[in-house]
């Protein structure tokens, strides 16, 4: 009897070890499958095959509970496909999941700008700035909207203010110079474009302006 009992114990232990091994292998295969899924999605995006890249992660983007990163990446791939309404909806879903996400809030601006919804994009950008006052990307996207709607006074003041926080940045100086040029402040625009050349020697727009206004 003792011998039989010992055999039964050994069998049960072996069964438990096999079950643990099987579970470990299942987890390993699942992790590998997910890694392959992401790798393939990035590979397809690199080839410009955005719909296929999105299809790779669709099960994660639509699952419950929500997968935040999959939602944001799916929104980005929708945007690249030109599916702007869908992209905005997915960015909003990501934002509903994590209201502190600056990335999702910035993402909302992209489809709005692509649809020339400048006022909406500015409003979205200001929501970002309410939480992160000197977020560079939000400021630049708002400047794009200000330029698109010919708000030259606003753009000049805005670019000047942000440029003081990022004094080595050429992009901000370009927007500031464009605003001053549109306001016919040629001398100031030339000074700003000259600063652009200091930061980016040979900058095409700055070089052209300086030559045309000699």
Regions found by a protein language model. Give the residues of each.
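Canonical positions in the second alpha-helix
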Residues: 59-60, 93-94, 127-128, 161-162, ...
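Register position in tetratricopeptide repeats
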Residues: 46-47, 80-81, 114-115, 148-149, ...
């Amino acid at each position: 009897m003792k011998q039989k009992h010992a055999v039964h114990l050994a069998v049960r232990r072996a069964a438990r070890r096999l079950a643990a091994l099987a579970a470990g292998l299942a987890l390993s295969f699942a992790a590998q499958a997910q890694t392959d899924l992401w790798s393939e999605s990035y590979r397809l995006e690199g080839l410009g095959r955005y719909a296929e890249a999105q299809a790779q992660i669709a099960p994660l983007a639509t699952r419950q509970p929500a997968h935040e990163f999959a939602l944001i990446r799916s929104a980005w791939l929708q945007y690249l496909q030109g599916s702007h309404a869908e992209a905005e909806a997915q960015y909003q879903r990501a934002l509903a999941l994590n209201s502190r996400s600056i990335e999702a809030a910035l993402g909302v601006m992209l489809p709005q700008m692509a649809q020339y919804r400048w006022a909406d994009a500015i409003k979205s950008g200001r929501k970002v700035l309410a939480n992160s006052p000197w977020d560079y990307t939000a400021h630049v996207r708002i400047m794009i909207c200000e330029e698109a709607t010919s708000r030259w006074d606003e753009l000049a003041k805005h670019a000047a203010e942000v440029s003081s926080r990022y004094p080595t940045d050429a992009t901000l100086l370009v927007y500031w110079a464009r605003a001053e040029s549109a306001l016919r402040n040629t001398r100031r625009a030339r000074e700003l474009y000259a600063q652009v050349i200091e930061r980016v020697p040979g900058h095409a727009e700055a070089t052209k302006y300086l030559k045309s206004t000699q």
